[in-house]
Design a protein with these regions (language model features):
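A membrane-topology feature that recognizes alpha-helical transmembrane segments
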Residues: 1-84, 89-181
Length: 181
C-alpha cells in the first residue's frame, strides 16, 4: 500500500468519527457546529488531495467542488424559509468533498434510505424501544423538529466506509488480472 493511500484511509477514519459526533450532537441539541463542519471539509479536501496526487487528475476535486456549490445553492432557499437548519445546509455542502464527486450517487441512495428511516421513526416513535429515545423522539414530533444531520451523517459514514473497504480490497488484491495480461 502506498503512503498516500494510508494517509487517505486515516483521514477517512477520522472523518467517520467526526460524522458520528455530528450525528449525536445534532440528535441531542439540534445544533451542528461550524468547527465540526470546517474540520470535515478540511478532512475531505485532504483526502481528495491525496487521491488527486495518486491518480494524477484533479477532476474528482472539481466535481466535488461543483457538487458542494450546487447543494449549497439548492438548499440555501430552504434555510431562508426556515425549513432546514443552517448546519444541515453546511453539512450537505461539505459532504461532496468528503465523499468525492464520483460517489455522490451512492451517497444519495444511502441518504434516501436513512431519511425514510428517520421519517418512520419520528412519525411512529413506538418503533423504538421504550425509554429515553422514545420520549425524546415524541418530544421532537410535538415540536416539529427533525434532526436532518443524523441521516446525512449516517449516509456519509456508510459511503465513506464503503470507499475505505473498496480501497483496501483493491490495494491488497493479488493482482491476478495483471498477471493474466
Amino acid at each position: 500500500m502506498s503512503l498516500l493511500l494510508v494517509a487517505s484511509l486515516v483521514f477517512k477514519a477520522v472523518a467517520i468519527l467526526l460524522l458520528g459526533r455530528i450525528a449525536w450532537t445534532d440528535f441531542s441539541t439540534q445544533r451542528i457546529s461550524n468547527r465540526d463542519v470546517l474540520l470535515l471539509l478540511c478532512l475531505g479536501l485532504g483526502t481528495l488531495q491525496f487521491q488527486s496526487l495518486q491518480a494524477h487528475s484533479w477532476l474528482e476535486m472539481g466535481i466535488s467542488a461543483f457538487g458542494g456549490l450546487a447543494l449549497f445553492l439548492a438548499l440555501f432557499p430552504f434555510w431562508l424559509l426556515q425549513k432546514i437548519g443552517a448546519g444541515d445546509v453546511k453539512l450537505m455542502s461539505a459532504t461532496p468533498f468528503l465523499i468525492g464527486g464520483s460517489n455522490l450517487a451512492m451517497f444519495s441512495i444511502f441518504l434516501l434510505a436513512f431519511a425514510l428511516a428517520t421519517l418512520a421513526v419520528v412519525k411512529n416513535p413506538f418503533l423504538l424501544p421504550a425509554g429515553m429515545f422514545r420520549h425524546y423522539v415524541q418530544h421532537m414530533d410535538r415540536k416539529g423538529i427533525v434532526p436532518f444531520g443524523v441521516p446525512i451523517s449516517a449516509a456519509a459514514i456508510c459511503a465513506v466506509a464503503l470507499q475505505m473497504y473498496h480501497a483496501i480490497v483493491v490495494a491488497t488484491s493479488s493482482g491476478i488480472l495483471e498477471q493474466l495480461n
